[in-house]
Amino acid sequence: QPLNRIVQYIRQQEYLIQGIFEKKLYQIPLNEVLYFETVDKKTFMYTQHKIFECKKTLSAIEQDLIRSNVVRISKTALLNISCLVCVKPYPNHRLLAELNNEENLIVSRKYIPILRDKIRSGYYE
C-alpha cells in the first residue's frame, strides 16, 4: 500500500488540468487543485490563490480522475483529499471537510462512504 501511495502521488504531479483565468488558458497540476465545484452550470477549479473555469463537466472530470486523490463529496463538488486536513460532524448526518487553506466544504451524507473508502484505500498524500 505505501507503494500505491507513492505511485499515486507521482501521477498527480504529472496530471495537468486546463483552466481559464482572466481569458487565458492555463495548465494546472492536479496536486495544486483543492476542489472542483459546479455553480450555475459552470465548473470551477479552486487552487490556493485562484479560481479557474473548466470547460469539462464535473462528471467528466470525475471520470478522468477516477484513479486519483479526487473524490465526489456532493452533487456539485469534487474534493482533492490530499488537501483535506480533517472532517467534523455536521447537521443532518453530513460532514464538514476542512481544507489546508482553512476553507470548509460540506460532504453530503450520500457521499460519506465514498470519501471514507477513498481515504482508507490509501489514495492520498
Regions found by a protein language model. Name each.
Residues 2-100, 104-106:
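Conserved binding/recognition cores within well-folded domains
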Residues 113-114:
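C-terminal structural segments of small proteins and small subunits
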Residues 117-125:
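Short, charged, intrinsically disordered terminal tails
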